Amino acid sequence: MTEGYTNVAGQRLDLPDPTVALTGTTMGGSTYRVMGTVMQALVLNLKARQTIYTESGAMSWMADGIDMCTNTGGGLGSLLKRAVTGESLFLVDYTSERDNTLIAFSSDFPGKIIPVNLAPGQSIIAQKEAFLVAE
């Protein structure tokens, strides 16, 4: 007989750990894990006083010890560019108060998370809603 689960209230479900698709270190020295296969999530382990930013709505969960601040990300010009392209008008900064603080980000649609390290002054053009998080 194969082992399976029934729909019984209170039954424990021993689900497998999520697949870790990719691990690495950011340019700022934080470690990250890309979890999952189809609907991936990025889990960052932030260093003390490290700040990252994302568009509004991309954060899935965060641990205690992270301050959150919403801003326009560069003034009126940047705000207008994002409005014209249909992106979120506001950016959210997350700053870790201490070492080893976890925060996770995910997309609203299926796809792969690809880390891209950009040198100062380097830029990339990506499709709408492809941006997830940056340092």
Which residue ranges define each predicted feature?
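Composition-driven recognition of glycine/serine/threonine/acidic- and proline-rich low-complexity segments
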Residues: 1-135
